[in-house]
Design a protein with these regions (language model features):
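Juxtamembrane helix-loop-helix connectors linking adjacent transmembrane helices
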Residues: 12-84, 91-97, 172-176
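Structural signal for the C-terminal ends of transmembrane alpha-helices
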Residues: 5-15, 137-141, 196-206
């Protein structure tokens, strides 16, 4: 809350209703699909790479999930605060400072910072990939709204998954799918199809900011 208030008060993240006024509702549907389609493949990749959350992080995450304010913190406040800081402030400044030919460098730098602040490899790699997608959407729109929607969808899915299946954090994907790797691979393939379709749609629907 303090981060959101500070960045809004100091105008480090300019606030504008210009993007919302365009009523890009169907575009946001594809943003949600992009988030949902990326979650399972990224989890599969980190598991296959042998990366695990540190026990302290798992304990903290479980505590937040079971908290009365857990949904507010994870699904609402965290997406707004992180998008204001990393896309609305840091990436915005880098895009303004870099020549257009180097805009992807600005996105990579911001994504790397986004990964580093998570302070562990499992979340860090996931956050880096997510940061590339969020940065691309911000570069196209110069609005943090798509990023907030993406973040909201990703965190909301995780929140309700662990609420419905409290032991999910202690299981691998194979264990979660009944020790059947074929089922896991089919689920990952289906998720990648959703991800690919969403990325294709957003490439056309997110018009580059001129």
């Amino acid at each position: 809350v303090l981060t959101i208030a500070l960045f809004a008060w100091r105008k480090w993240t300019p606030m504008s209703g210009q993007y919302i006024n365009q009523r890009p509702w169907f575009t946001q549907f594809w943003v949600i699909c992009l988030a949902l389609g990326s979650a399972l493949p990224m989890t599969f990749f980190t598991e296959q790479a042998g990366l695990e959350l540190p026990p302290d992080y798992t304990k903290l995450f479980k505590g937040m999930i079971n908290s009365d304010l857990g949904f507010l913190a994870l699904a609402i406040l965290a997406p707004i605060a992180e998008e204001m800081v990393f896309r609305g402030a840091i990436l915005r400044r880098l895009l303004d400072a870099f020549d257009k030919r180097w805009h992807w460098s600005a996105i990579v730098i911001t994504a790397a910072l986004f990964g580093i602040v998570h302070l562990n490899m499992a979340q860090g790699i996931n956050a880096f990939v997510m940061g590339l997608l969020l940065g691309w959407m911000y570069m196209r729109t110069r609005s943090i709204v798509p990023g907030i929607i993406f973040h909201f969808a990703n965190n909301t899915m995780a929140f309700f998954l662990y609420r419905l299946f409290p032991n999910a954090a202690d299981k691998t994907l194979v264990e979660f799918y009944g020790d059947n790797m074929t089922n896991v691979l089919m689920a990952v393939a289906f998720s990648l199809m959703i991800f690919g379709a969403a990325l294709y749609q957003l490439n056309f629907r997110l018009q580059p900011k001129r």
